[in-house]
């Protein structure tokens, strides 16, 4: 804005003042004229329009906040300030802010504070004519309120100073403070600075402000010609903006009551990240509020083996860093209402790196905005040149906007001898551009983030190792004996004592961990022993244990068996039952140390989630922690809001499909360490695994990086290492040739689906081609082949003779039958008398390649005296298997997802005690978790899962602690079908776990071997 425009605004304002009616009473009649009153009026002038139309409820709220009511226009005294017309200046500032990308919290509408009713603040120096005025009539509040106002004033002054420093970086703080003290508003200070210093301080800002001023001149010319009606609309808009600001400030004050340790500016930033949604901001703050009580081992000190007391209250600077690292990270799931396109911005990356400790890779990318070219420092030039020269195609695809084809083109252009040659070659090829070169910086920064995480984790691991070594060397020992609270008739295995000591060690250092022992090694017992240890140390809870529904009875039983001293509350049941439990908890009618609940009950409703957000839990233990492998899922986000000081995951399969799942688990247990780097972790570890012979050097490095990162936080032991006396487990692949009829049906289905794919036909079968092929490979009756449409029409007519269907429509009955499988129709024929003759023959029911093989296998096992646990993915397959077992007169029990939770434990007990029961039928999903079936020694997988770890879970129902016989695992695979491909893929997935857990030649041991070995040494094991 130039001086001419400013003078014109003053002239217009003076004209309005001269035209104003003289009969209006002046404020001086009610109180002495002073610069104080002038400043106060000037401070509140902007919000006048909004207060005129405020409803009664809003007026009441303002009274409670002790805000100053504004006098009407006709009572205002004419101000003599040279910056009267704030509207025009505000337009100028808004335009400049848009151009400069200035944060909204720097604008006056956010930074200005409302002052209480009786407080008068001096914001401008009095003139010589007014210095003689006394101030005896000025009333003040009590000292505490006055201190609060002074604190608010200081915050306001600091915010204004920070804003002016951004706009005028070449000016000293003292000059800018004088401007702030001489004016009452942010707009006035900026306008005064523009008059005194010129447009703004140098560089790109100067050019942008100049262009903004030119645009503002045009807008000023237009504003002179505006009719009064338009100016009235502007006034309404200004009033609306002021009203929005007041609402935002009320939200900030409301949030500050919940978190008094946070500054208002920090709370504003949190609210802006959540689009001023109070409830979402409150939940985010609550998630990380307890993290202030938990410090990373890198931040703690260890002296002579004694625990240094945790610092419960962070300093303000630490809190600010924490807020920016955590709260600013938005959830990566459906909670985001708007998901903006992630476009790499070099300038923003540099600015972000100044405060984000999780992504500040020491950025040396320097943008020169005085010209159109982007200039990059030589350090990054060399890194980018080397990256494009040596990276594989898989690595190049990590570059934003770089597809597989573009990566292939880049490799064909090699070698790149220098920077200029790189630009020349890239610009000549269609589809390639200079943007790919600049975007390489993103990948390099992400790698730097991973390297920093590795270094941080290595420091933690070294401290833990040093601590155990020191304790062992001093002879003090780290041998946490079995807690006395545990049942004295039961004893922990030696390796379980090592697990207990490891849990105690990471707890002492303020870390959270993942107990990832192989299935069947007693993770449940180790967790219960750890809770007993905490109880003896004075930490009596409350603790939370979240488990799958199928294992809740087993957990309750084990806790009562191993540690009856712990008071356990089971949070499970219908909505009404859980409502009563919540009522008892809130009113402290329940006496408990541990709450046991299921994943579904913990997060199924808002009331359930609210309960665990409000409860201040010490430890939250999550059984089958691999259910948290997807950090983008709603379940993951809901469980993250559980208000627990510490977290412990129990999982037998920490690595399943890719390394990202493992990183998701780490982010869950240590959010204050990993949450600031989730985007980098997601990109670096999300690629699929490959066989060892196809892995590039980079992919092997990724596995090494992941091993280094997880080392301090995870304890993983396999049965072969710790259970020397555990009977071995043998795996056997049984290739089953399909029956002649089944092979014909499979070939016909395969050709039909293949033809549909080639013709790009969109039909219902194409929705799940793989599932259709799997079902046919298992049993033909899982499709409808034998019940032709003609048969179904006859059956639908006969159904009208049934008393239950005498008035039914045969066409509708026919439609219902069309979507049923052969076996479902067979069961239907058995239920109704008039269609009983349409039942399938037993030969058709048993006509399956797997059934032929299974019949022979079961006969042999029964003769040997073995007992069998038989798993299937499909409940309908279990129905057909029941027919097979009845036909061969084998006694059996069945458990699947439809079995009531209360009945499951009784079925398990019955099978383990009644040795005459030969087979236990189980669905893989319902019966593969947390069930002890050591009375059986043979596991048959009728059909394998796409996830091999689900099958491993099923196998370990028998191969676990307590097993006395050799365990045989038989997998039935239909020969020449899709199941052979599934088996090959599953073997590749299992290879990833081997890569993560086996000992490399260059390493001293597996992931936690150094710590675990030292613990065993200190315990004399």
UniProtKB/Swiss-Prot annotation:
Question: Residue numbers of motif DEAD box?
Answer: 1000-1003
Q: Which reaction does it catalyse?
A: ATP + H2O = ADP + phosphate + H(+)
Q: Where is the composition biased (Basic and acidic residues)?
A: 7-19
Which residues does the annotated region (Disordered) include?
A: 1-82, 124-151, 201-246, 329-366
Main location per the UniProt record: nucleus
Q: Where is this cross-link: Glycyl lysine isopeptide (Lys-Gly) (interchain with G-Cter in SUMO2)?
A: 77, 330, 466, 719, 991
Q: Which UniProt keywords apply?
A: Acetylation, ATP-binding, Chromatin regulator, Chromosome, DNA damage, DNA repair, DNA-binding, Helicase, Hydrolase, Isopeptide bond, Nucleotide-binding, Nucleus, Phosphoprotein, Repeat, Ubl conjugation
User: Could you tell me which CDD domains the record lists for this protein?
Assistant: DEXHc_SMARCAD1, SF2_C_SNF
All copies of domain CUE, residue ranges: 156-198, 247-290
Q: Where is the Helicase C-terminal domain?
A: 853-1005
GO CC term, one of those recorded: site of double-strand break
| Limits of the Helicase ATP-binding domain | 504-672
SMART domains, per the entry: DEXDc (SM00487), HELICc (SM00490)
Give the observed phenotype of the deletion mutant: Deficient mice have reduced viability and show growth retardation, skeletal dysplasia and impaired fertility.
Question: What are the Phosphoserine sites (modified residues) in this protein?
Answer: 57, 79, 124, 127, 132, 144-145, 151, 210, 213, 235, 238, 298
**Subcellular location(s) per record:** Nucleus; Chromosome
Q: Which GO terms describe its biological process?
A: chromosome separation; DNA double-strand break processing; regulation of DNA recombination
Q: Which domain of life is it from?
A: Eukaryota
Gene3D superfamilies in the record = P-loop containing nucleotide triphosphate hydrolases, Tandem AAA-ATPase domain
Motif extent (Nuclear localization signal)? 716-733
Question: By its UniProt entry, which PANTHER family does this protein fall under?
Answer: SNF2/RAD54 HELICASE FAMILY
Name listed for the protein in its UniProt record: SWI/SNF-related matrix-associated actin-dependent regulator of chromatin subfamily A containing DEAD/H box 1
* Species annotation: Mus musculus
User: Its encoding gene is what?
Assistant: Smarcad1
């Amino acid at each position: 804005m130039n001086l001419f425009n400013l003078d014109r605004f003053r002239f217009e304002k003076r004209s309005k003042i001269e035209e104003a009616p003289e009969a209006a009473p002046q404020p001086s009649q009610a109180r002495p004229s002073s610069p104080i009153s002038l400043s106060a009026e000037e401070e509140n002038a902007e919000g006048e329009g909004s207060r005129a139309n405020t409803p009664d409820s809003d007026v009441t709220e303002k009274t409670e906040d002790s805000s100053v009511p504004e006098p009407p226009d006709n009572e205002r005294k004419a101000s003599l300030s040279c910056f009267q017309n704030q509207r025009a200046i505000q337009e100028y500032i808004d335009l400049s802010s848009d151009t400069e990308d200035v944060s909204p919290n720097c604008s006056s509408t956010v930074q200005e504070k409302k002052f209480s009713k009786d407080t008068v603040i001096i914001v401008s120096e009095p003139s010589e004519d007014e210095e003689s005025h006394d101030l005896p009539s000025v009333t003040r509040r009590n000292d505490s309120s006055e201190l609060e106002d002074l604190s608010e004033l200081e915050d306001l002054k600091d915010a204004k100073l920070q804003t002016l420093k951004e706009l005028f970086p070449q000016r000293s703080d003292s000059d800018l403070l004088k401007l702030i003290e001489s004016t009452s508003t942010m707009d006035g200070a900026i306008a005064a600075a523009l008059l005194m210093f010129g447009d703004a301080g140098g560089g790109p800002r100067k050019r942008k402000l100049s262009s903004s001023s030119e645009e503002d001149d045009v807008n000023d010319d237009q504003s002179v010609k505006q009719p009064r009606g338009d100016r009235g609309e502007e006034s309404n808009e200004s009033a609306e903006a002021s009203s929005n600001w007041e609402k935002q400030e009320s939200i900030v004050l409301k949030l500050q009551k919940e978190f008094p340790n946070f500054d208002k500016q920090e709370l504003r930033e949190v609210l802006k990240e959540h689009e001023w949604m109070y409830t979402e901001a409150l939940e985010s703050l609550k998630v990380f509020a307890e993290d202030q009580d938990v410090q990373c081992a890198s931040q703690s000190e260890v002296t002579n083996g004694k625990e240094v007391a945790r610092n419960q209250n962070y300093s303000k600077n630490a809190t600010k860093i924490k807020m920016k690292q955590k709260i600013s990270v938005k959830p990566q799931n459906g909670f985001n209402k708007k998901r903006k396109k992630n476009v790499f911005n070099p300038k923003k990356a540099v600015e972000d790196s100044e405060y984000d400790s999780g992504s500040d890779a020491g950025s040396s990318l320097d943008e020169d905005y005085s010209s159109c070219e982007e200039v990059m420092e030589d350090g990054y030039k060399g890194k980018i040149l080397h990256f494009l020269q040596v990276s594989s195609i898989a690595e190049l695809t990590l570059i934003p906007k770089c597809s597989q084809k573009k990566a292939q083109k880049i490799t064909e252009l090699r070698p790149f001898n220098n920077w200029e040659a790189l630009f020349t070659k890239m610009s000549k090829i269609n589809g390639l551009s200079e943007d790919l070169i600049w975007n390489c910086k993103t990948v390099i920064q992400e790698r730097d983030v991973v390297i920093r995480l590795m270094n941080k984790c290595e420091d933690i691991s070294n401290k833990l190792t040093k601590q155990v070594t020191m304790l062992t060397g001093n002879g003090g020992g780290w041998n946490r004996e079995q807690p006395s609270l545990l049942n004295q008739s039961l004893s922990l295995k030696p390796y379980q004592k090592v697990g207990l000591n490891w849990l105690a060690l990471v707890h002492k250092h303020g870390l959270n961990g993942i107990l990832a022992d192989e299935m069947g090694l007693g993770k449940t017992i180790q967790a219960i022993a750890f809770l007993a240890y905490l109880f003896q140390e004075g930490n009596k809870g409350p603790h939370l244990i979240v488990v799958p529904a199928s294992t809740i009875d087993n957990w309750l039983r084990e806790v009562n068996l191993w540690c009856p001293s712990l008071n356990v509350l089971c949070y499970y049941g219908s909505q009404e039952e859980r409502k009563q439990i919540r009522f008892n908890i809130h009113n402290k009618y329940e006496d408990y140390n541990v709450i046991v609940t299921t994943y579904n009950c913990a997060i199924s409703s808002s009331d359930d989630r609210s309960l665990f957000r409000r409860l201040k839990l010490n430890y939250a233990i999550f059984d089958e922690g691999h259910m948290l492998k997807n950090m983008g899922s709603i379940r993951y986000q809901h469980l993250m809001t559980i208000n627990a000081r510490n977290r412990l995951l129990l999982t037998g399969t920490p690595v399943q499909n890719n390394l990202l799942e493992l990183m998701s688990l780490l982010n869950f247990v240590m959010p204050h360490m990993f949450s600031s780097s989730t985007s980098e972790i997601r990109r670096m570890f999300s690629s699929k695994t490959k066989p060892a012979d196809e892995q590039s050097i980079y992919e092997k490095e990724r596995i090494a990086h992941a091993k280094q990162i997880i080392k301090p936080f995870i304890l993983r032991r396999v049965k072969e290492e710790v259970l020397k006396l555990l009977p071995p487990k043998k795996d056997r692949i049984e290739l089953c040739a399909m029956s002649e009829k089944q092979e014909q049906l499979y070939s016909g289905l395969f050709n039909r689906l293949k033809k549909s794919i080639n013709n790009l036909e969109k039909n219902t079968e194409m929705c799940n081609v793989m599932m259709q092929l799997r079902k046919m490979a298992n049993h033909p009756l899982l499709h409808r082949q034998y019940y032709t449409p003609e048969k179904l029409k006859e059956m639908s007519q006969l159904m009208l003779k049934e008393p239950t269907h005498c008035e039914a429509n045969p066409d509708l009955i026919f439609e219902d039958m069309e979507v049923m499988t052969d076996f479902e129709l067979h069961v239907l024929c058995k239920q109704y008398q008039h269609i009983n003759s349409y039942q399938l023959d037993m030969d058709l029911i048993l006509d399956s390649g797997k059934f032929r093989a299974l019949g022979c296998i079961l006969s042999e096992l029964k003769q040997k005296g073995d007992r069998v646990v038989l798993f299937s993915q499909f409940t309908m397959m279990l129905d057909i298997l029941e027919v097979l077992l009845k036909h061969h007169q084998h006694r059996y029990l069945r458990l699947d997802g439809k079995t009531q939770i209360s009945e499951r434990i009784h079925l398990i007990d019955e099978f383990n005690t009644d040795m005459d029961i030969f087979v236990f039928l189980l669905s893989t999903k319902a019966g593969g978790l947390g069930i002890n079936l050591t009375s059986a020694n043979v596991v048959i997988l009728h059909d394998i899962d796409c996830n091999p770890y689900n099958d491993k879970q099923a196998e370990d129902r028998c191969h676990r602690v307590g097993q006395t016989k050799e365990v045989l695992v038989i997998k039935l695979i239909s020969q020449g079908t899709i199941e052979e491909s599934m088996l090959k893929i599953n073997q590749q997935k299992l290879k990833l776990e081997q890569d993560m857990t086996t000992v490399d030649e260059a390493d001293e041991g597996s992931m936690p071997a150094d710590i675990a070995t030292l613990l065993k040494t200190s315990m004399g094991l």
